[in-house]
């Protein structure tokens, strides 16, 4: 673990339904998929979707671009 980072107890847990309070996805709601207490961030289903470029591998020789959820700060969400 990096120095200077402290685990914080968050107000949301996995599988909670939350609403986004600020940012580009403001007003959207979804289920919490994952919680990162050390970074104070959460991943919410269907919120903060970004494109990720995947390298070519033996199973996928062409590579691909997939869309997935990225974490947002826990202070930007509230339970619904």
UniProtKB/Swiss-Prot annotation:
Annotated segments matching region Disordered: 53-80
GO MF term set: rRNA binding; structural constituent of ribosome
Cellular component, GO annotation: ribonucleoprotein complex; ribosome
Domain of life: Bacteria
Keywords: Ribonucleoprotein, Ribosomal protein, RNA-binding, rRNA-binding
GO biological process, one term: translation
Nucleus is among the record's keywords: no
Pfam families with a match to the protein in the record: KOW (PF00467), ribosomal_L24 (PF17136)
Chain's role: One of two assembly initiator proteins, it binds directly to the 5'-end of the 23S rRNA, where it nucleates assembly of the 50S subunit.
NCBIfam families in the cross-refs: rplX_bact
UniProt similarity note: Belongs to the universal ribosomal protein uL24 family.
Subunit organization: Part of the 50S ribosomal subunit.
Name of the protein described by the UniProt record: Large ribosomal subunit protein uL24
């Amino acid at each position: 673990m990096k120095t200077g980072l402290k685990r914080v107890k968050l107000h949301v847990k996995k599988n909670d339904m939350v609403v986004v309070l600020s940012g580009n996805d403001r007003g959207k709601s979804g289920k919490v998929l994952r919680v990162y207490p050390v970074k104070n961030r959460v991943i919410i289903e269907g919120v903060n979707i970004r494109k990720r470029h995947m390298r070519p591998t033996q199973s996928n020789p062409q590579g691909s671009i997939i869309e997935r959820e990225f974490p947002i700060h826990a202070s930007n969400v509230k339970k619904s």
